[in-house]
Amino acid sequence: MQLFLPETVLFSYYVPNWIQALQWVDLGALGVAILAFAVFLLLMVLFPKVGAIAWVTFKEAVMQPLFIILILFGLFALFFFLFIPYHTLGDDIKLVITQGLTLIKLIAVFLAIWTASNSIADELEGKTALMILAKPVGRRKFLIGKYFGVIMAVILMFFILGLFFLNSISYKVVFDARESAKDAPTVLECLHQMKITLPGLLLSFLETMVMAAIAVAISTRLSLLPNLTLCLTVLAVGYLAPVILEASIGQNPLVAFVARFASTIFPVLAHFNMETSIATGQFLPNLYLFWATCYALLYCTLATTVGLLLFEDRDLA
């Protein structure tokens, strides 16, 4: 009697190169999520009152409909950017990276301003903050907790939009090659474009941190509309400050003084711009990212200190 064993069937499937390149992105995203969670736990352990205020502010920001609307709008726009014909003779991906970084940054800045105004200015005007400050919670802990809550909401937005953006960049490499009738790009080519994009996400996040600190400081005195107007002014002057300073060389002493004063008081947001690196296809050096991080942290500390001074003198009664 013969026994017939069933044949073993091996199923093979093809994984596109742009998807294979994303395994490194997934590992990096997991690392960022673990790091952010560890920092939050450390904040809750070392400063429980600040952590509690930050957590409440974060939940309020995430649960509001505006957060969902901004996320959906960002995802749709990033997806739409992939299929726009830019007619750049093979450099479409550079424009996609630039537009995507600008979009994510502007959406995150708007979220930071909106959240700061809702969680600080509205609570101060509605006397809701008195219930918190009546407890053994100082004004410094209240304001710092609000700032960390805003940053936590910004981190979540950057995590969602940034992860989708890196996925779209990896696919854009394959899409452009297919449209140009070129050979299919390798995994390394897809990974190369994502590596160029990563420093841009970091710099955009640092810029959003600076603008969030300014928005929190302004929210101690002004409501949403004046806050939004002033923050947009700071954003514009921050990018134009180097140009104004360079143009003032050899001009009237008063013009030169105003230019130097503006470049000193306002944040030089051009430090967080990497369009030159994108245009040349080069990586930003780690030393530049280090000093940009130091500059952002220094200015955030300065803006928060100014906010504390403004908040200490405000009458809440």
Task: Place the predicted regions along the sequence by residue.
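Short cytosolic juxtamembrane segments of multi-pass membrane proteins
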Residues: P226-N227, L235, E312-A317
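Aromatic- and glycine-rich beta-strand/loop motifs that create alpha-glucan
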Residues: F47-F67
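Membrane-interfacial helix-loop-helix junctions in multi-pass membrane proteins
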Residues: Y14-A21, I265-Y295
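Helix-loop-helix units of permease transmembrane domains in multi-pass membrane transporters
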Residues: A54-K59, I120-G149, F311
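Junction motif at the cytosolic side of a transmembrane helix
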Residues: L42-V50, A217-R221, C294-A317
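Short, strongly hydrophobic alpha-helical membrane anchors
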Residues: M1-Q23
